[in-house]
């Protein structure tokens, strides 16, 4: 039984019903509908912390989905799972792939920045200030782009950019 039919959560059930109605009335191919079903099931599994199941669904959605824009969100969600699992290098790969297909994905830019910032913090702890500054500069570049796309979001990043004197080139 597909995960979307097992949801106990009212919001998930409502989303599933609305999504099913939209799939029936919108002119989409069987393949597109199937890809969306896998994507939806992946999101549901991911929300419940069932990352292995979510990845299986996302990979199947990727196999079926041909639209670059839709694929960008699948790739982004795969990146989220790898980030949650502490697999930052893998996460970056998926975020970059998502941005190749959809450069207007500020959340991917933000997550890339967060990873570089985290790595910068690790470099400081290791006593490598030169590397940390390079990583912080890289984080700043990604945050600036995310903020350019979504100016009212990422307030903490905006504050960090101001505090570290990296904002002058932003926005």
Swiss-Prot record:
It is found in: Plastid, Chloroplast thylakoid membrane. HAMAP family: Ycf3. It comes from the Eukaryota. Keywords: Chloroplast, Membrane, Photosynthesis, Plastid, Repeat, Thylakoid, TPR repeat. TPR repeats lie at residues 35-68, 72-105, 120-153. Its main location: plastid. Essential for the assembly of the photosystem I (PSI) complex. May act as a chaperone-like factor to guide the assembly of the PSI subunits. Belongs to the Ycf3 family. It holds the Pfam family TPR_1. One of its GO terms (cellular component) is chloroplast thylakoid membrane. GO terms for biological process: photosynthesis. Disulfide bonds: none annotated. InterPro entries: PSI_Ycf3_assembly, TPR-like_helical_dom_sf, TPR_rpt. It is a peripheral membrane protein. Signal peptide: none annotated. The keyword Thylakoid applies. SUPFAM superfamilies: TPR-like. Coiled coil: none annotated. This is Photosystem I assembly protein Ycf3.
């Amino acid at each position: 039984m597909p995960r979307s039919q097992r949801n106990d959560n009212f919001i998930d059930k409502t989303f599933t019903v609305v999504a099913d109605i939209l799939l029936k009335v919108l002119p989409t191919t069987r393949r597109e509908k199937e890809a969306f079903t896998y994507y939806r099931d992946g999101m549901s599994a991911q929300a419940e912390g069932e990352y292995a199941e979510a990845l299986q669904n996302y990979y199947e959605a990727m196999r079926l989905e041909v639209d670059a824009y839709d694929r960008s969100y699948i790739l982004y969600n795969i990146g989220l799972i790898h980030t949650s699992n502490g697999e930052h290098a893998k996460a970056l790969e998926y975020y970059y792939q998502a941005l190749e297909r959809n450069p207007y994905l500020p959340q991917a830019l933000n997550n890339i920045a967060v990873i570089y910032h985290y790595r910068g913090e690790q470099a400081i702890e290791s006593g490598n200030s030169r590397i940390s500054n390079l990583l912080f500069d890289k984080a700043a570049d990604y945050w600036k782009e995310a903020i350019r796309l979504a100016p009212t979001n990422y307030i903490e990043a905006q504050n960090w950019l101001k505090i570290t004197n990296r904002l002058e080139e932003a926005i």
